[in-house]
Amino acid sequence: MTAVEPRPVPQLEATRPYPARTGPKGSFLYKMVTTTDPKVLGTMYLVTAMSFFMIGGLMALLMRGELARPGLQFLSPEQFNQLFTMHGTIMLLFYATAIVFGFANIILPLQIGAPDVAFPRLNAFSYWLYAFGATMATAGFITPGGAADFGWTAYVPLTDILHSPGVGTDLWILGLAVSGLGTILGGVNMLTTVVCLRAPGMTMFRMPIFTWNIAVTSVLVLLAFPLLTAALFGLAYDRHLGGHIYDPATGGILLYQHLFWFFGHPEVYIIALPFFGIVSEIFPVFSRKPIFGYTTLVYATLGIAALSIAVWAHHMYATGAVLLPYFSFMTFLIAVPTGVKFFNWIGTMWRGQLTFESPMLWSLGFLVTFLFGGLSGVILASPPLDFHVTDSYFVVAHFHYVLFGTIVFATFAGIYFWFPKITGRMVDERLAKWHFWATFVGFHTTFLVQHWLGAEGMPRRYADYLPSDGFTTLNTISTIGAFVLGASMLPFIWNIFKSYRYGEVVTVDDPWGYGNSLEWATTCPPPRHNFYELPRIRSERPAFELHYPHMIERMRAEAHVGWGSGKHGTPQDDDALLAKK
């Protein structure tokens, strides 16, 4: 018998959408530090912002643990002050604002058919300014006097050298100035990219709603953030150079409030409008319908942006120094374009073929939660009602319903929606739905009861209360909900790790099947410069037309925006125009 050499058995290897290694060992960190690829920078924004979200969430759990029962449990009033100051700062400026630029860097160039952003190196510089500024402000916790402890609004005279002598205050001021500069430069970059780098055929009214919202947000950034920077430099000048810019004797306290809130209210829409754009991308895909009222959505976005810079002093009703009828009327008015958006989102789903994958669930959670927050906002817009609940937990509940409802729900909707495009792998739908329901139940348990706490008179920012105040039961319920909310992040973290390493590999351009915008017309993940070839752009749905060419004539015939409406000519006119270019 002759021995036969055994045939080699092929070794099983995990398939990966990326090569196992693209350079010498240890080069990953160098590439990350020196990259100008907007997709890599966007991922870095997302990871950094979500890390700060977790840190801010841990601070919230410490505060809720302290407030669960009357009496001081484990925090001193000074520590409590530091926690709510840094919690607000981190969540608004280091999580919400930053994650906007995470999504914008990854998705916006893809949606307009651009190979890169307008200023790639400035883009990288913006990220590192944000990262260093955020780290600087948070580093106050390791200084002898602790972190900033005057509330995230930093009202004067709480921030002067007499009342806040510690280094933590200076780190907070400088950290916000540095990260704010990064935000300003990011806004310049995104606006220039939208104006200058759109693909042939991509007119303004063929841009996706998300791109429109990022462009409008960038304009608001350029209006609002320089004012914050100026106000912060004024604080530093008063603290260390003996200035009297915010001297109470000359009305400096109200001057600071006007400066801060002229930044602060547009900031709310800077961190809301992009997430309106995210859900506007998701609803059509999972309703199997085009977006309802595309043009109206664009004008509603412009209306919200215009009104957002006209209502800043509704945060100052209690000062008695603002024109109540004007600011109340303008605040009521801002509900109109927001209501138009709700009408369009519901119209998009109306009689659609709905499927409830995780991005759609999170978007519906956004709708419900943001609606509640908007209704309590209408209450607060009325001065007679606002006077009774100002600086109470009613305001805390409203603020979290509006911002958590908008930002966090839409953040997770966007992450689950674009995760296949970013990584080339699908997420685990079962874990994503567990994550959604735990977050939804935990959030509403935490913050719904805080409306009643505020109506009963519990002030915000207090570290303690008396058993006789009658706040114990509702505070206990709120704390239980907060810990459910905190635990809901565990399936998310595991899902992202598991899906990135072992998730099902995406082999098609559009894993959801009904994508409309251009990011669904390139590979998952996209190449370095986004596209190997671009499809013709003849409407606001180029990817859908690419994948379903037999639907084009019907779409033209039924269009309200596009060639069928008679507003823009014919497809042949479009071809002739492209040939001239």
UniProtKB/Swiss-Prot annotation:
Membrane topology according to the record: Multi-pass membrane protein
InterPro entries per the UniProt record, alphabetical: Cyt_c_oxase-like_su1_dom, Cyt_c_oxase-like_su1_sf, Cyt_C_Oxase_1, Cyt_c_Oxase_su1_BS, Cyt_c_oxidase_su1_bac
Xref: Pfam families: COX1
Sequence positions that bind Cu cation: 265, 269, 314-315
Keyword field: Cell membrane, Copper, Electron transport, Heme, Iron, Membrane, Metal-binding, Respiratory chain, Translocase, Transmembrane, Transmembrane helix, Transport
Cofactor dependence: Cu(2+); heme
GO cellular component, one term: plasma membrane
GO terms of biological process kind: electron transport coupled proton transport; oxidative phosphorylation; respiratory electron transport chain
Protein task: Cytochrome c oxidase is the component of the respiratory chain that catalyzes the reduction of oxygen to water. Subunits 1-3 form the functional core of the enzyme complex. CO I is the catalytic subunit of the enzyme. Electrons originating in cytochrome c are transferred via the copper A center of subunit 2 and heme A of subunit 1 to the bimetallic center formed by heme A3 and copper B.
Entry protein name: Probable cytochrome c oxidase subunit 1-alpha
Encoding gene per record: ctaD1
